[in-house]
């Protein structure tokens, strides 16, 4: 069978490419070996946020007296939390399938094998395509730490499905995944220790705000070991032993469970990528241009496989650009205003340049900061909670970066992203009328 577009991978990049191509009138084949929605929908973005919302609700109930609401006894049911997570995932997977079907996308379940740029095999069937879009995503990276193979560690998948709480949890890696799980388990009463090799958690996020978030979770009982290298792992009857070294010397952490959350890497093996001879980056990702085109004509790459930004919303936009290229529509990918969010409680979000990235690029910038208490809505809904909004301006007073610590940072950061993408100056942004009272008004107040 022949299609105008063959897509390998049904995650955010893959299903967005398929839907966009279908809407554009192209014949589309989407091959997915697991479940539609990819890591994001099945074992990443959505399930973690579902768990975190349960934890946040539990936290709110425990502290309801701050808002003059008395709840005598507050408890949680972990198996039901996990069951609800699974229900949410199933519902959204069905939604993705329905959208693809409505746009005449042919969906095949199985492992794809690329024969050449116009030929893909899946099972006993061979398919021909005019254009090939690779959206194979990324996989958990487990570093070769001595003893790692002898330890019964968790990955994010295990943590998502555990129906029993460990008394203690050691997390290797203080990035987004590590901190979100640290937040979840800490809220439910687990003793959490985060071991991070860098000098601050959440590498890539604003360092000042990351430190403030860490300080908040330190108050809540999480122990952080920064600038700390894990040198060995072992398993005992008491649990996992994490041996480490840092400036203070050598030490170890013993925890009932160990979560490995060091990071992810693009999936480049197992589907015949080598048969395409695509140009790759130094880190093994596939090199693409601003139209998501690879070094081989009619072959496109979107999502984590590009190595640019391992974020679902980036993948969605890349997929749109790739299909627009196939359709002959003028479009190009921009990474200037890709927002990043960590769904802890409080949330932390940022878009554009951080102070660290601006310094590295030798950009002259001005920083404006304001406590979130300048937002009336924030004060009304966050009793006894502090937060910070930070905006970076360049020499022309254009907005080049914005960062927020405080709820709901995830819902307001797009306001700043829009300003950055459009190249707005502080004066232009100041003219925008914000509804009152909203937390988003903080972006008007800060200027």
Residue ranges and their predicted role:
Residues 140, 284-297, 377-390, 394:
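FAD-binding beta-loop-beta segment adjacent to the flavin cofactor pocket
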Residues 2-3, 19-26, 31-165, 193, ...:
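Glycine-rich flavin
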Residues 6-34, 39, 46, 50-57, ...:
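Flexible, glycine-rich terminal cap/loop adjacent to redox cofactors
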Residues 149-165, 252-327:
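FAD-site-proximal beta/loop scaffold in flavoenzymes
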Residues 1-3, 123-131, 248-257, 295:
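Core beta-strand elements of the Rossmann-like FAD/NAD(P) dinucleotide-binding domain
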Residues 1-13, 165-175:
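Beta1/beta-strand and adjacent pyrophosphate-binding region of the FAD-binding site
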Residues 45, 136-191, 195, 223-224, ...:
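Glycine-rich dinucleotide-binding loop and its adjacent helix/turn
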């Amino acid at each position: 069978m022949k299609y105008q577009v063959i897509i390998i991978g049904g995650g955010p990049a893959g299903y967005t490419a398929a839907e966009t191509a279908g809407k554009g009138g192209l014949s589309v084949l989407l091959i997915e070996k697991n479940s539609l929605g990819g890591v994001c929908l099945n074992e990443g973005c959505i399930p973690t946020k579902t768990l975190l919302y349960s934890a946040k609700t539990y936290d709110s109930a425990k502290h309801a007296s701050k808002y003059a609401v008395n709840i005598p006894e507050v408890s949680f049911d972990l198996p039901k939390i996990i069951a609800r997570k699974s229900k949410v995932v199933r519902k959204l997977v069905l939604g993705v399938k329905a959208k693809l079907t409505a746009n005449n996308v042919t969906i095949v379940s199985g492992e794809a094998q690329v024969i050449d740029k116009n030929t893909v095999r899946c099972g006993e069937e061979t398919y021909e395509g005019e254009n090939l879009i690779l959206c194979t995503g990324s996989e958990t990276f487990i570093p070769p730490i001595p003893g790692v193979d002898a330890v019964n560690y968790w990955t994010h998948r295990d943590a998502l499905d555990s129906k029993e709480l460990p008394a203690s949890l050691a997390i290797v890696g203080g990035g987004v995944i590590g901190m979100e799980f640290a937040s979840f388990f800490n809220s439910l009463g687990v003793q959490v220790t985060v071991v991070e090799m860098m000098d601050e958690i959440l590498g890539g996020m604003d360092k000042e705000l990351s430190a403030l978030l860490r300080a908040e979770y330190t108050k809540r009982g999480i122990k952080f070991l920064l600038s700390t290298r894990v040198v060995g792992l072992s398993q005992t009857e008491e649990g996992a032993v994490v041996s480490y070294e840092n400036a203070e010397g050598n030490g170890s952490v013993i925890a009932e469970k160990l979560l490995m959350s060091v990071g992810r890497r693009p999936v480049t093996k197992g589907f015949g990528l080598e048969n395409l001879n695509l140009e790759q980056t130094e880190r093994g990702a596939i090199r693409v241009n601003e139209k998501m085109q690879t070094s081989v004509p009619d072959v496109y790459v979107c999502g984590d496989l590009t190595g640019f930004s391992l974020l679902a919303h980036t993948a969605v936009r890349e997929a749109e650009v790739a299909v627009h290229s196939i359709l002959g529509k003028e479009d190009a990918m921009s990474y200037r205003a890709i927002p990043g969010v960590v769904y802890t409680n409080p949330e932390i979000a940022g878009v554009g340049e951080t102070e660290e990235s601006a310094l590295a690029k030798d950009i002259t910038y001005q920083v404006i900061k304001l406590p979130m208490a300048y937002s009336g809505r924030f004060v009304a809904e966050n009793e006894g909670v502090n937060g910070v909004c930070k905006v970076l301006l360049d020499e022309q007073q254009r907005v080049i970066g914005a960062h927020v610590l405080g709820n709901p940072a995830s819902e307001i950061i797009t306001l700043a992203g829009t300003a950055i993408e459009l190249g707005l100056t502080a004066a232009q942004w100041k003219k925008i009328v914000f509804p009152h009272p909203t937390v988003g008004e903080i972006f008007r107040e800060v200027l």
